[in-house]
Amino acid sequence: MDNLRFVLFVFFIFLSFLLWEQWQIDYGPKPQAVAQTDGASRPAGDLPQRPSDDESDVTVHTEAPTQEGSRRIRVHTDVLSLEIDTRGGDLRQLDLLNYPVSKEQPDRPVRLLTDQGDIFVAQSGFIGAAQQVPNHHSLWQAEAGEYRLQDGQDILRVPLTWSDGQGVTVTKTYILRRGSYLIDMEQTIDNRSNTNWTGRQYMQLQRKEPTSAQEDSQFIRTYTGGVLHTEDKSYEKIAFKDMASGNLDAKSRQGWIAMIQHYFLAAWVPPAEDESTFYTKALADRVFVIGAYSPPAEVPAGSSQTLKARLFAGPKLQHVLEGIAPGLELTADFGILTVIAKPIYWLLETFHGFFNNWGWAIIFVTLVIKALFFKLSEASYRSMANMRKLQPKLVELKERYGEDRQRYNQAMMELYRKEKVNPLGGCLPILVQIPVFISLYWVLVESVDLRQAPFLLWLDDLSSKDPYFVLPLIMGVSMFIQQRLNPPPTDPIQARVMQFFPLVFTVFFLFFPSGLVLYWVVNNILSIIQQWYITRQIEKNTARA
């Protein structure tokens, strides 16, 4: 019993250390970004490869990229501010206006897409006959230099045009909507030439591996990298190292590709009915591409055709992502314990709907979890109380048999059988709480809803550490009290080591998200009340007997 409890406590400390280490990776100071040249000057090697099964006379159009004649088109909605480069029609900068970088910088929005430093841009174009199709190095024309969603306006259309000078005109239109992070893209091919037009639409995300991604953790961690969804695999991570080791080549309907990071993502969603081909490429300087291209489209001379795709660039709002594409909500990555984490998230959302405060939602989720495990905890606490009652007899056995461990263990097990006490019963709450603890950790870390969410008084961001360490100190005190209610180990070395556990946990929890510490404090307080009551009842019954 003592050894098992000791091992469980050591394991829990190790688990806490690994979670703390990952929190430091996610929230700690990042290394200075290395200056990077503008992504528009990259070589044409970032274009998709010619499809291996395409037998037509098709080549990848490799118009030399240059900045000459290009300009930036600025687009503003109520939730997005972005820049589109006429060189390629790329989305080269995108700010999320409702998500400030930090509480200290409320007027500085998160910049999800950028072509500076660690570049992250969204690109699109066509694969087809040379000089007959535009790609993301081609020069497009725009009617205006700025587009803004006006009061009373719900839809904003941003058109760009390209012509081959031989009768083929392509119009790329970005369609943005009020309150939405979803951008529809329509590419209309108007073929007024004398020959049929053939091409494949592609859309891709080009990103430099962030400096922080070079730090490795041997435990589950917040993921930054590529993601693929197909009919066969609902959520497949394509890490930067996977892209570096080999190119992806997969076909599927109802698929999508994405680059995700903490709280936010950008994802291209091709038409669900098309069998798209999904690919990756590794470029120089740790720059990677993940994308998709469509089946070949043929536009006869004298006709036109519109090809569509959707780009989501914004926060990982699960209820929003569920309505865009199957499996897209999984980008809020709760890890291997998603089956537990999703109900916890649903409970949090439900209570937040009542209280409009994520702190109170966490407290009431804790109450629900405690209620679900009440009977289990009651049985465990009764076992621990009975163990505490047996403590004098165990000490007596220890003194009687001294260093003879075999005889001592035999006598101890005989005592347990005689008193009808389960020595393992007190360990069950710890085992049960570990997956719940991990699941809640990832819900708090991954859910953008809780990002910078205030609670009360000094707790103005439940996703970050307590600035004054009040909650971790309260948690340490609660652990100390709870430890006093438990039977101490008969082994003096283990007893001395376990005395330091509240202090060690307090140090670890100093740097944990305050929302997680809030859960642990409330859980400990409820456990103390329950355990104290059960112990008191057993002591009263013993006194009467």
From Swiss-Prot:
The keyword RNA-binding does not apply. It is found in: Cell inner membrane. The chain crosses the membrane at residues 6-26, 354-374, 425-445, 462-482, 500-520. Coiled coil: none annotated. It is a multi-pass membrane protein. Disulfide bonds: none annotated. Residues 32-69 are annotated as: Disordered. One of its GO terms (cellular component) is plasma membrane. One of its GO terms (molecular function) is membrane insertase activity. It holds the Pfam family 60KD_IMP. InterPro entries: Membr_insert_YidC, Membr_insert_YidC_N, YidC/ALB3/OXA1/COX18, YidC/Oxa/ALB_C, YidC_ALB_C, YidC_periplasmic_sf. The keyword GTP-binding does not apply. Keywords: Cell inner membrane, Cell membrane, Chaperone, Membrane, Protein transport, Transmembrane, Transmembrane helix, Transport. It comes from the Bacteria. GO terms for biological process: protein insertion into membrane; protein transport. HAMAP family: YidC_type1. Belongs to the OXA1/ALB3/YidC family. Type 1 subfamily. Required for the insertion and/or proper folding and/or complex formation of integral membrane proteins into the membrane. Involved in integration of membrane proteins that insert both dependently and independently of the Sec translocase complex, as well as at least some lipoproteins. Aids folding of multispanning membrane proteins. Interacts with the Sec translocase complex via SecD. Specifically interacts with transmembrane segments of nascent integral membrane proteins during membrane integration. This is Membrane protein insertase YidC. The gene is yidC.
